[in-house]
């Protein structure tokens, strides 16, 4: 008599071909590269429209509880403070060019 030492195949392994055939017969909806880019662009446009202005984002005054009970006081006020300088803030105007990655930099 033969004895097998391997693990018996799982249900999914036994039905692999059947599952593949069922998948392709179902005619799944696929999106081409051009359509994918169009969908992504329209999503980005919606996100840009939805982004609040700094005033809407960071200058909030409300009654207690309206901001998820962030404070036990009667008013919650958050304001953004700017000094007109971007020094040390991690922001840039896009003029920074990173150095080219070379073997010398890696060593």
Swiss-Prot record:
Low complexity bias (residue ranges): 82-95
Main location (coarse class): nucleus
Post-translational modification: Phosphorylated with a circadian rhythmicity, probably by the double-time protein (dbt). Phosphorylation could be implicated in the stability of per monomer and in the formation of heterodimer per-tim.
Region (Disordered): 81-107
Coiled coil: none
Keywords, sorted A to Z: Biological rhythms, Cytoplasm, Nucleus, Phosphoprotein, Repeat
Any one of the GO CC terms: nucleus
Superkingdom as given in the UniProt entry: Eukaryota
Subcellular location: Nucleus; Cytoplasm, Perinuclear region
GO terms (BP aspect): rhythmic process
Subunit comment: Forms a heterodimer with timeless (TIM); the complex then translocates into the nucleus.
Function in brief: Essential for biological clock functions. Determines the period length of circadian and ultradian rhythms; an increase in PER dosage leads to shortened circadian rhythms and a decrease leads to lengthened circadian rhythms. Essential for the circadian rhythmicity of locomotor activity, eclosion behavior, and for the rhythmic component of the male courtship song that originates in the thoracic nervous system. The biological cycle depends on the rhythmic formation and nuclear localization of the TIM-PER complex. Light induces the degradation of TIM, which promotes elimination of PER.
Name of the molecule in the record: Period circadian protein
Gene that this sequence comes from: per
